[in-house]
Amino acid sequence: MASFAQFGNDLYTGKRSYNIIGKRKIWYGISALLILIVIVVPILRGGFLFGIEFLGGSQFQVASSAGLNSTEAQVLAQNTVLKVEPGSNPRVTIVGQNSEVRVQTDQLTSDQSVAIQQALAQAYKIKDSEVTTSFIGPVWGQDITRQALTGLIAFVILASIVMALYFRTWKMSLAAITALLHDLIITAGVYGVFHIEVTPAAVIGFLTILGYSLYDTVVVFDKIRENTGEDGAESRRTFAESVNLAVNQTLVRSINTSVVAILPVGSILFIGALILGAGTLRDISLALFIGIIVGTYSTIFIAAPLYAQLRSGEDAVKKRDKRTRAVREASLVVAAK
């Protein structure tokens, strides 16, 4: 623990430093590759797997899998439904430790639903009443999507304005929003790559991570503003070096914040997915789990380097860096004598 504290202190004082800003092309390349993967792979796999809330359809919940293992229970349910309704496109999942079987199909008529309910009850050797049926229309999911997009647009606009006013430069705002979109694309893309079902709860999780990512970015940017604002005419650091120092100074804090945030989210994900079988808990926590990891990466390796790059072309920054390098060269000449 003491060594980790010393590590953080060394980063803060500059005794130890990682050249994060100077290697920004590497981080950009990694992000570009990830974004390419999460866009291309879902396309090759036929797109995202949207939940029944978005597409509409019928759902059947079997109270018990009759002592079968997960694979056997899924195969039995799939074959049973296809035997009754060959074109129903059944999607079978096992819910929780109680091994409840959930079957989702395309929209069915009342008679078709009753026939499948009876067939499932017979296949699993339970009463008809132990197989619950429900119909879900696509309207609710469409409303959630529309509201989510509206909320996303409003969030991006308001966050851009607030950050531009707070930091007094639109370039910090642009860097932060770019990092947010980076997080959203990769987090949502992971669902497409691994063919994880996208539900309204997952969409809510996608939007929630934007708040965390923005908070982490603001902490780093505040330190960047402090460092670059303190640098006067006699500064011994270039602008990029001041930004890099700020990132190193907040590195331990970013990691600690992420660990503290991800532990309870991971616990909820474990409990929701494996113990309770609660779909909503699982969907939200999975999106948050992925988003926190990606958000921490983007704050350190995307937002700060991008801001330094955006400012590097300014005349004032160029003059300052030129003056700093000239002072260093003069010092080396004097030292050589």
Give the predicted meaning of each segment.
Residues 1-337:
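A structural signal for conserved, well-ordered secondary-structure elements
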